Design a protein with these regions (language model features):
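Glycine-rich, proline-tolerant flexible connector loops at the mouths of alpha/beta enzymes
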Residues: 1-19
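Histidine-acidic metal/acid-base catalytic patches
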Residues: 82, 100, 105-116, 120-190
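Active-site acidic/histidine proton-transfer and metal-coordination neighborhood
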Residues: 17, 23, 27-114, 120-122
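A short, structure-level motif marking secondary-structure boundaries and short turns
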Residues: 4-6, 34-36, 60-62, 150-153
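Residue-level marker of alpha-helix boundaries and capping positions
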Residues: 10-11, 41, 67, 157
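Soluble or luminal CAZymes and related metallo-dependent hydrolases
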Residues: 12, 16, 46, 158-162
Length: 190
């Protein structure tokens, strides 16, 4: 599959991307964040294409899972700075604020996609201070409720995640940070 995807990227013109974007926008849908998996393993030309694709779709950031390898964050940060286009590194419960701060130190356009449920579960503190300190680097938030100490996902209001406080901070400061409701439901098979 990776080779098929690589070949597809080499064939799809940015004109086709514009047509795709136009269809979505005509339906009232804006594409703000473009999720790209496997970007750290891509050749330079492919990474350039991903940035052009994201911009062509109308996005304001690329999202990808955070790497704990500094060389990955430096390399992708160089592309982000070259294209003057944010990369929001998505963190999980194992991601500490220092991981994002390290990424920030490597490139102006390295940012954070903070999943506030994962943040609470892994760091056992509110994400609000981190959001306040780094709001200019946060591309978007994933909203979910989890318990401290790597606890499970819960219905909103039953976990330890201060969802209301986070949303109020965004609203009161008028920060342009997209907050996306991430819902988890068990999937029935069969």
């Amino acid at each position: 599959m990776p080779e098929q995807l690589r070949q597809w990227r080499q064939k799809v013109s940015l004109e086709r991307v514009k047509e795709f974007r136009d269809k979505y926008e005509a339906a009232g849908v804006l594409i703000e964040i473009v999720k790209v998996d496997g970007i750290f393993n891509m050749a330079d030309k492919e990474i350039d294409y991903c940035f052009a694709l994201a911009r062509g779709l109308g996005g304001r950031a690329i999202s990808t899972e955070i790497s704990h390898k500094e060389e990955d964050l430096k390399r992708l940060g160089q592309f982000a700075d070259k294209h003057q286009f944010m990369v929001g590194y998505h963190g999980h419960a194992t991601t500490k604020p220092e991981h994002w701060e390290t990424a920030f130190s490597f490139a102006k356009y390295n940012g954070a996609n903070v999943d506030i449920g994962h943040f609470v579960a892994g760091n056992n503190v509110s994400p609000v201070p981190f959001i306040k300190q780094h709001h200019e680097r946060i591309t978007h938030l994933h909203l979910k409720d989890r318990k401290f100490h790597d606890g499970p996902n819960t219905p909103f209001g039953e976990g330890d995640t201060p969802i209301r406080e986070v949303l109020r901070v965004l609203r009161d400061n008028q920060w342009n940070i997209q907050a996306t409701n991430i819902r988890f439901r068990p999937v029935r098979i069969g």
